[in-house]
Amino acid sequence: MKERDFQAEFGKRNLITGVFELKFCKKTSIRFDSVAKHQEAALLAVEGDGLYHKITDQPFLKDMNFQRKKPFDCFNLAGIPAYIVIMFWKARKQKNVYYIPIKRWCFCRDAVGRKSITEDMAEGEAMFTEDYTAKGNK
């Protein structure tokens, strides 16, 4: 499994409303700096006063002049829950997904005195947890 597989699975299974930064971890921990500063700032803005973003017009394939249909031109979101969503993956074992609110993520990053978050720590910080081991859809 790769991060793109997690992205596809998340799209099928997620029932929670909000904005999400997805992270995929095959190790015992994931670095806090895997969430870039601009991503963190955007997630905090969405939970707060708002974030405006224009969706770019991009070709579906390189060197092609036609474009993928986009749902709309832009959005302005405010007061929306924002999460870092981490899947801790181990081959042929349970695949746990943790929804950590962005403010909890920032607090944990600043308070724990280490550079990464373990699965046990993520479980303690998560607002929601899901098991993606079994195949399933919405």
What name fits each language-model region?
Residues 47-104:
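Nucleic-acid nuclease catalytic cores
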Residues 17, 38, 77-79:
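Short connector loops at helix/strand junctions that flank enzyme active sites
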Residues 1-13:
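Nuclease catalytic cores
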Residues 110-138:
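Charged phosphate-binding loop/patch that engages nucleotide di/tri-phosphates or the phosphate backbone
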Residues 33, 68-69, 102-112, 116:
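Sequence/structural signature of beta-propeller domains
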